[in-house]
Structure formats: C-alpha cells, structure tokens
Amino acid sequence: MSLRHMSRRASRFGVVAVASIGLAAAAQSVAFAAPAFSVSPASGLSDGQSVSVSVSGAAAGETYYIAQCAPVGGQDACNPATATSFTTDASGAASFSFVVRKSYAGSTPEGTPVGSVDCATDACNLGAGNSGLDLGHVALTFG
C-alpha cells in the first residue's frame, strides 16, 4: 500500500500508519540526500518502554506520521493507540520519545481491526513518513 493511499485514509485512523512503504523514497530525485531516521534503543525492548526517535535531512517544517506496525495476515497491523504526528524544525530535523508496545490490537490504516499483534513473534517496526516522503523503518525487537 502506498503512503499516498494511506494518507488519504488517515482520517479514519487518526494519523497515517507508515508500515511497509518505500515507494515514495524510491521515487525521490537522486539530487536529494536521503533523510536519516533512527530509533534508540531498537532491541532488547520491554513493553511500554520509551525510545528516542531522531530524524534529519527531511523537509523543513513538514508534518510526518509515525506508527508501530507489523505484517499480520498479509496486512499492515498498526497500533492506533500510539500512532502520532510530528513536525520537523527549520533544518528538517526532529527528536522525540515514542512509547513502544510488545503487544497490541492491530488495525489497518483504514481502521479495520486486524487482530492481536505480538512483537515477540511478529516482525514489528517503527515507521515514519508522509504522502511525499518515506523517512524509513526500524525493526523493533523485544527482550
């Protein structure tokens, strides 16, 4: 599912869940440096832990969305309880905390319930972007 498609349906989800996109990043001009998206720590996590998210090289003053998701039954199952938006500063950077969950009731970006997600067995990730740019995805592992 493309990020552009997901953003059109964001009103039902509350924010765009950016799970397994990448088309927007692939379509970017080669003249622009790719943005950097990092999560620390990303492994050995525990339920309810706060992780530090850092973004650089993105567009200045843009709103992006971030969500914890996992592929479940061929669909993206995101956590609507923690999905949120953030805005980059004048240099295209942002730093903030995000609470990760080991398990949650997953929903598609359209808001359709998908079922339970258990990040101990499902391949969970934290992804960020908007309809014009995929900032990236970081795999999450729980200890």
Swiss-Prot record:
Q: Which UniProt keywords apply?
A: Antibiotic, Antimicrobial, Disulfide bond, DNA-binding, Signal
Alphabetical list of InterPro entries matching this protein: Neocarzinostatin-like (IPR027273), Neocarzinostatin_fam (IPR002186)
Belongs to which family?
Answer: Belongs to the neocarzinostatin family.
Q: Name one Pfam family in it.
A: Neocarzinostat
Disulfide connectivity for this sequence is C69-C78, C119-C124
One GO MF term on file is:
DNA binding
Protein role: Binds non-covalently to a chromophore which is the cytotoxic and mutagenic component of the antibiotic. The chromophore binds to DNA as a weak intercalator and causes single- and double-strand breaks.
| Gene this protein is translated from | axnA
Gene Ontology terms: biological process: defense response to bacterium
The entry's protein name is Actinoxanthin
Its domain of life reads Bacteria
N-terminal signal peptide: 1-33
Q: What is the lineage of its organism?
A: Bacteria, Bacillati, Actinomycetota, Actinomycetes, Kitasatosporales
